[in-house]
Amino acid sequence: MTQYIFPCIDGHTCGNPVRLVAGGAPRLEGATMLEKRAHFLREFDWIRTGLMFEPRGHDMMSGAILYPPTRGDCDVAVLYIETSGCLPMCGHGTIGTITMGIENGLIVPRTPGRLSIETPAGKVDIEYRQEGRHVEEVRLTNVPGFLYAEGLTAEVEGLGEIVVDVAYGGNFYAIVEPQKNFRDMADHTAGELIGWSLTLRAALNQKYEFTHPEHPQINGLSHIQWTGAPTVPGAHARNAVFYGDKAIDRSPCGTGTSARMAQLAARGRLGVGDEFWHESIIGSIFKGRIEAAATVAGRDAIIPSIAGWARQTGLNTIFIDAERDPFAHGFVVK
């Protein structure tokens, strides 16, 4: 009998789940985390689906697996897993992983209060504030973000023509701002946004190409960001980020906030040093800031940072036994 055991630490970042896999991870081949990610997807994607999909996970589940870094300037490497695949970078996942990893001794930074992690998208610098054994806040300085395309259009049944900008913040995001056929996310239910997101994402991916100019392995539009006016004091904007097949991010979305800041910076509405507090669909806040200007393959870009908090909710030992369990590798109800 072959039974695989995965000890996990469960938690959430500003309301969105994070499952940190504390053991049982496979050895991966590759000179970089981007190459290791490709190996994982080729041979071990059943681990992702088994841990993220029902019956062990759910539509909003996301997680991370720790690895030794391939580069000397990083303390640890992170592979992100979720229902939609293995993201190059995940902001809320990073905040949760760092928080629970440090609190449980899985991550030991060389310099207390700061560390660098290797992600498939590149190096991410981290600062964290710890009080006793608890990590109270994590700020990550993300990979460069940039506006990729403006004014793209697609037809969405039930709404009509929708115009979006697409920006990169670690993943590609179609940003839907107030317009003729969409006034504010507050006018609609999460279920409506999910249904429209599936149509919009498919239409945009069919009509346009989305490829990172320096990392062609990062391609395709994966996320839809619906926007609206803030409802929490201090917030500058509100969002509902769609990912996977049925998920709306409960957090303000770290890479989505990075992409939004890149879009606003390209329009001249944010500059270096400016803060951007982003409100989620449930009212939690990420504190964004533009740390520096940058360029990506000749494009104007920014170096964004995101601050947020996470809490551990429990310990979980998960079994995957394909010989006895017909749903060992998970399932999705569509």
Swiss-Prot record:
Its EC number is 5.1.1.8. It comes from the Bacteria. GO terms for biological process: amino-acid betaine catabolic process. The keyword Oxidoreductase does not apply. Substrate binds at residues 91-92, 223, 249, 254-255. InterPro entries: Pro_racemase_fam (IPR008794). The keyword DNA-binding does not apply. Pfam families: Pro_racemase (PF05544). It is an enzyme of class 5 (isomerase). SUPFAM superfamilies: Diaminopimelate epimerase-like. One of its GO terms (molecular function) is 4-hydroxyproline epimerase activity. Belongs to the proline racemase family. Homodimer. This is 4-hydroxyproline 2-epimerase. The gene is hypF.
